[in-house]
């Protein structure tokens, strides 16, 4: 499991380089060739919305010409390498999604496939921060909570230590932030 390598140092460098290719392969299989991330952000781009992608990792969920932030320099290095080819206007910053404050509000804030990799307190802090940054919407995309019925294999859990807790608690956490 590449997640067992961590996100920093030599293990993080290896993880980041594997993540870009393996994520594309896995997504191609899981979503039948659809680019699910692009399907989510494209309508916002079509309407000229500014987008901040929190916990962007290797940049696969960061729209062209927009901003991605992550706490792993190794992940950002890979993101910059691949987006330099596709879109030079995409910006990546080494920042913590719990604390990052841009100089101005951003129309749409996204966080894709990251919540299952962090503890509950981080979910809450990121949601609170994203709601302060976003002018219009905060979009979270991650593993569906009913995935727990499939009994994730031990090898997955070794690299994803927060997965079971995420699956068991994310609905309650999100409910606390539901619009009234």
Question: PLM features: what roles do these ranges have?
Answer:
Residues 114:
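Hydrophobic adenine-recognition pocket in adenosine-nucleotide-binding enzymes
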Residues 118-129:
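A short, conserved alpha-helix within the catalytic core of class I
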Residues 110:
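A conserved beta-strand element that flanks and buttresses the S-adenosyl-L-methionine
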Residues 28-47:
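Conserved alpha-helix/loop element of class I SAM-dependent methyltransferases that forms part
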Residues 1-21:
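N-terminal, positively charged/glycine-rich alpha-helical extensions of SAM-dependent methyltransferases
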Residues 134-138:
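Short glycine-dipeptide loop
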Residues 52, 57-99:
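Class I SAM-dependent methyltransferase SAM/SAH-binding core
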Residues 139-180:
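C-terminal alpha-helical "lid/dimerization" subdomain adjacent to the S-adenosyl-L-methionine
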